[in-house]
């Protein structure tokens, strides 16, 4: 039964491989080097601003302190349980 099912799959895969690459799609428009660099620079500046804003929000929030406290408390509880059981 396995051979019966795997042979058609093998035939389809071989046909796909032997068919070769598909027809070429339209060539993308050539961008000027300067406009491409300007777009890349603008993207980099935008990304930099967003990352700075994100890190500033994280620094100003109390999430890191709360997370650190939660981990400390949980670790302390685990240590206490291990001391009691051993």
Curated annotation (Swiss-Prot):
Main localization (coarse): secreted
Gene3D superfamilies (UniProt xref) = Apolipoprotein C-I
Please name the GO terms that the record assigns under molecular function. fatty acid binding; phospholipase inhibitor activity
- Highest taxon of the source? Eukaryota
Q: Which UniProt keywords apply?
A: Lipid transport, Secreted, Signal, Transport, VLDL
Localization recorded for this chain is:
Secreted
Which residues belong to the signal peptide in this entry? 1-26
Query: Which Pfam family, any one of them, does this sequence belong to?
Result: ApoC-I
Kindly list the GO CC terms recorded for this protein.
high-density lipoprotein particle; very-low-density lipoprotein particle
Query: An example of a Gene Ontology BP annotation on this entry?
Result: lipoprotein metabolic process
Extract the InterPro entries matched here: ApoC-1_sf, ApoC-I
Q: What else is known?
A: Apolipoprotein C-I is present in acidic (APOC1A) and basic (APOC1B) forms in P.paniscus, P.abelii and P.troglodytes and perhaps also in baboons and macaques. The two genes for ApoC-I arose through a duplication process that occurred after the divergence of New World monkeys from the human lineage. In human, the acidic form has become a pseudogene sometime between the divergence of bonobos and chimpanzees from the human lineage and the appearance of the Denisovans. Pseudogenization resulted when the codon for the penultimate amino acid in the signal sequence was changed to a stop codon.
Q: What does this protein do?
A: Inhibitor of lipoprotein binding to the low density lipoprotein (LDL) receptor, LDL receptor-related protein, and very low density lipoprotein (VLDL) receptor. Associates with high density lipoproteins (HDL) and the triacylglycerol-rich lipoproteins in the plasma and makes up about 10% of the protein of the VLDL and 2% of that of HDL. Appears to interfere directly with fatty acid uptake and is also the major plasma inhibitor of cholesteryl ester transfer protein (CETP). Binds free fatty acids and reduces their intracellular esterification.
What does the sequence similarity comment in the record state about its family? Belongs to the apolipoprotein C1 family.
Name the UniProt record assigns to this protein? Apolipoprotein C-I
Q: Source species, please?
A: Ateles geoffroyi (Black-handed spider monkey)
Classification lineage: Eukaryota, Metazoa, Chordata, Craniata, Vertebrata
